[in-house]
Amino acid sequence: MKKNTFWISSAPRTGSMWLFNVTREILKISGSDVLPKKIPQWDEEMLELYEKQAMYDQNELNKYVLKLHTILNPDLPRSKILSTIRDPRDICISFLEFMKTDFQTALKSTKSIIKYSNTYNEYDKDYLKIIKYENIENKSIETVLEIAKFINCEIDYNLAKQISEKFNKDNVKKIINKNNNNL
């Protein structure tokens, strides 16, 4: 049975939103109907969508990209997992800077990366792909190509470059600022 669900399962502040957006974009460009259209905001909603819809969807064009901050089982039907990993010091700083948390909360959240790393390092490499945050920043085109290969989509270097540019930090900041101004 073909894979129709691609999970983005990572500790917070590790590049998971970039990975989510890039995975969706690769699938769209490849001709898939990317679901869900309206993105659930909670892990429980993502899991419910999978259990009630994605697992039973027989339309081969439909591909689900579901993002959560939960460690998943090593054998989810019709699924593959993409995860991100980042230097724990950078995660802690990111929490303090962008989430405006206190140090203890940031440190506690940072420690979750150890659980992800210890668990996911045991999973089959055909089922799980780990993306390093520094590659998102420094080798984004190659990383886009890596993701495409893992999710069985063929894209060329130029398309990977377009996707990389679309989701680079500066362009994402512009989109966020534009959306904030429209509120």
Task: Map each language-model feature to its residues.
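PAPS-dependent sulfotransferase catalytic domain
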Residues: 29-32, 60-165, 169-183
